[in-house]
């Protein structure tokens, strides 16, 4: 069910030192999970309601194509020799030649009256690896058909010449096993030159190629270890996808111990004084070597699918924000395709819930879709539903008697339209409000921060109370003072109402 994604072989050399204690990584929970597989489905386990929080639509986040965050991890500087990162692949190619053994045949048929028919044919001649180096060879430019040998009134008179000639052919050389790798070889590889090919008349011969364990091409990288569990998580290099180490094991090669990654790559660690020594279980098999040439295309295919899934998720996020509603189908786009600790989402009664929980790869779903079997599990388990009912689960999973899984339902011709039913999203209230009010009584309630502006507002909000308590005595005091001031002032004579005209006349 799982599609393993592989990349060309790398050699990772970590410079860190010697003398220290041994720490066994905790691999009980995540080491059994396929790191770079794309399972049919992933689902949270042990993700209870107390691990979830309500979030707004803007807080949703699409899963990353690769988990490139290193929070809570210790980084070990490393040097990596990678066949996939370097631009120059000339060092891993071995120059050689195809040795051909071909019979050049001219056929002549002569009639009674002297008429002739000339035919030419190439015949494969079986060539063994031992014979390939025993004869002198020529070049393809020097090949020719022999002159016809004709006899009167005789058909099919043959004249043959056998040639050994070479054509240039370079092949890959596995730097670990030193095997020659090419699709021309039987089984795709050859241990020692000369090598038999799929054609009975062609043998490949080449030089020794690159030496085993060669580390001439190196790049800078890091190895990451979890601070709490001391579990080696991954190795990364700029511009390259992370190499998973969840299922890493120890293997002996070139006279020393190596860490073999999930994809079969090898890591050699040299510890500094006082550094913690990382310990892994021994590999059950001794398999080492480069994967086939098609693996690069398989990885690119997985990368394209992951990019398409992320684009679909971003479009779903935009629709959720613009409509302020969510459907089980849209929420399913936020499911991480890889097992491990991931963001998980659920929808319930107008709210979207988010948590960071362990998700497992689902290898098999029962026919009625009510149970599933996790990766490497032997029994089936019911889907966890965090809200205590039998309807809503994680990432759009819903249904009572029939469980609807949008990621699987989309492949059904007559799909259930319940995964398209929208749910309006309520705004997330302040947690302090929820401590005193029910969700139905939240209208008109707000929480503000207590800053300088609010302190000033608080002061003025108490002014009516202060006025009520001290205003009346103050008014009485002002009235008494006014009366006292008025009584001690001398009287002012009243002015005449008019001036008679004759008074003015007498003064003249």
UniProtKB/Swiss-Prot annotation:
Is Signal one of the keywords UniProt gives this record? yes
**Residue ranges, Virion surface compartment?**
21-461
Give the Intravirion compartment stretches of this protein: 483-508
Q: Which GO terms describe its cellular component?
A: membrane; viral envelope; virion membrane
Q: Which residues are glycosylated?
A: 56, 400-401, 438
**Entry's localization field:** Virion membrane
**Gene Ontology process terms (BP):** symbiont entry into host cell; virion attachment to host cell
Function comment: Binds to specific receptor at cellular surface, bringing about the attachment of the virus particle to the cell. Plays a major role in the determination of host range restriction and virulence. Class I viral fusion protein. Responsible for penetration of the viral nucleocapsid into the cell cytoplasm by mediating the fusion of the membrane of the endocytosed virus particle with the endosomal membrane. Low pH in endosomes induce an irreversible conformational change in G, releasing a fusion hydrophobic peptide.
Oligomeric state and interaction partners are given as: Homotrimer.
The entry's family comment says: Belongs to the novirhabdovirus glycoprotein family.
What protein name applies here? Glycoprotein
